[in-house]
Amino acid sequence: MKKIFIILISLLIANSAFALETPMKKLSKYFKNGELIKILSYTSAKWPNGYMSIKDGSYKNNPIEVDAFIAFPKKGEGPFPVVMFAHASGGAALFTDEWFKFNRLAAKSLLKKGIGVMFLDNFSARGQRHTYKDQSTISHWSTVMDAFKALEYLSKDPKVNIKKVGITGWSRGGAISLMASEKRLRDALISKDLYFAAAQPRSPPCWSIGMFVNPQPIKENKTWMVLGGADIFTLAKDCVKLGEKYKANGADIEVTVKKGWHHGFTANYEAEYEGDNATFNECPGAFTNDEGIIIYEGNSAYPDCIKWGAKIGGNKGGVFKKPFLKFFTENLL
């Protein structure tokens, strides 16, 4: 056991050599009683072997400590429900960005209702600020591992009602929030009695990142996925189809498509074209089969199928906040 511990510490030191300082320090400006914490997680193998490294346990060869910021309600002693916020490809800096206020405003409202909040930084510990120009720099499997390991961390905190933990995010964070309901991942990574009670993904990439072609949902999870009907960054139709597979396999899932809404619709600016984001809608669809192998749909070829630019924004945060809060209060309180 001592030898294993020494090896783990050595690997953590080696993997932290390129770590960046988390931008979430700035969250203390908005949440005075919050604190930065470190969570032991892991980095998966690179594409296309990300899930296979989880399935066979080899992910354990790459431990890493990721950053998180947690805040509890000022009133009461708990245990409290908690909502976890997962960021998009723009990284954890979006949590304090002046043009992306929705998450922290929603978090403040949740705290007032008696629900704790946690913000998760998937990128800084892995030496990246963002991934929107090159999504391959950090795998989606690594980031969903972070979410499950954060759930495991919360299970050891007496201030947390571990049966009432939710998760939310948009784009990459939406993918994490949707995949957080996957039984195969939970069972491989943490105790089988842990689960996210509620998940609210927005505009996840359902076509190109290796989502399970035959999802196995955790029965205790309730998911509300919200999509932009005008989103050309992550197409709504692909997530509607995936949502139908979840429901057919027993998931408690509702999918809502908002007509005319674009990618990142909760950003507090009107939708505008941004040209430095890669889109993969014309690329072959990539999915993970029951054996853990990536399979493809379509005949187009990389890298010619990759396009650049899409409209992002929409200033819909004010409209969306009320049903967002209702979803979590109904399912966590």
Give, region by region, the residue ranges found by the protein language model.
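Alpha/beta-hydrolase
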Residues: A86, L120-N122, R202, K258
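Primarily recognizes the serine-hydrolase "nucleophile elbow" in alpha/beta-hydrolase
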Residues: K55, S139-K219
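Short beta-strand element of the alpha/beta-hydrolase
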Residues: G78-S89
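Cap/lid segment of the alpha/beta-hydrolase catalytic domain
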Residues: S89-V144, E182-A188, A267, S300-D304
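Sec-dependent N-terminal signal peptides
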Residues: I4-I13
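C-terminal catalytic histidine-bearing segment of alpha/beta-hydrolase fold enzymes
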Residues: D252-L333
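N-terminal cap/lid segment of alpha/beta-hydrolase-fold proteins
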Residues: L20-G78
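The feature captures the conserved acid-bearing segment of alpha/beta-hydrolase catalytic domains
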Residues: S191-G260
